[in-house]
Amino acid sequence: MAIQPLRLDPITVLGKQLVIELFDCVDTRFDDIQWIEESMLEAARQANATIITSAFHKFSPIGISGVVVIAESHLAIHTWPEYGYAAVDVFTCGDVLDGAQAVRVLSERLGSQRHLISSMDRGLGGHRLGLLSRSLAGNAPVDGDSPTLRWALGQGTGVA
């Protein structure tokens, strides 16, 4: 079987990456590695992801980094408890996983009061054209009616 060359086509989207910045996280367990890992696993479960494995590390004196590897790609987190801040990536491939639900679960569990969500379609050729990334901030927790999240997923008008 001959290997087919990749066509660099800007409309060939292989996945969506949500880059989420959660600010003013008020949950007191924000530096508890077991609770952060369980929160990430719960976000993956509620998003209908197929969990493969997870790995988390607790820094000294504070802070946690971790990743949940899923069949559909990954969820990653880095926390700065001293700032009440978490950086989260939700990268999804295919149309089974609900990345928005993962974002909602993490925002709620961490007690985030403000957020910034960037959305990027990942795929073949699009980066060369610079057409794929956009961001929007919100001054409220991410919930089921979050206009920021709807916008990041291409379902809203861009009003936070």
Curated annotation (Swiss-Prot):
Alphabetically ordered keywords of this record = Autocatalytic cleavage, Decarboxylase, Lyase, Polyamine biosynthesis, Pyruvate, S-adenosyl-L-methionine, Schiff base, Spermidine biosynthesis, Zymogen
Reaction equations catalysed: S-adenosyl-L-methionine + H(+) = S-adenosyl 3-(methylsulfanyl)propylamine + CO2
Protein name stated in the entry:
S-adenosylmethionine decarboxylase proenzyme
- Keyword RNA-binding assigned: no
Q: Which residues form the active site?
A: S73, H78, C93
Which family, according to UniProt? Belongs to the prokaryotic AdoMetDC family. Type 1 subfamily.
- Pfam families, from UniProt? AdoMet_dc
State what this protein does: Catalyzes the decarboxylation of S-adenosylmethionine to S-adenosylmethioninamine (dcAdoMet), the propylamine donor required for the synthesis of the polyamines spermine and spermidine from the diamine putrescine.
Required cofactor(s): pyruvate
The top EC class, named as a word, is lyase
> Could you provide one GO biological process annotation from this protein's UniProt record?
spermidine biosynthetic process
Which EC number(s) does the record attach to this protein?
Answer: 4.1.1.50
**GO molecular function terms noted in the UniProt entry:** adenosylmethionine decarboxylase activity
| Cofactor detail note | Binds 1 pyruvoyl group covalently per subunit.
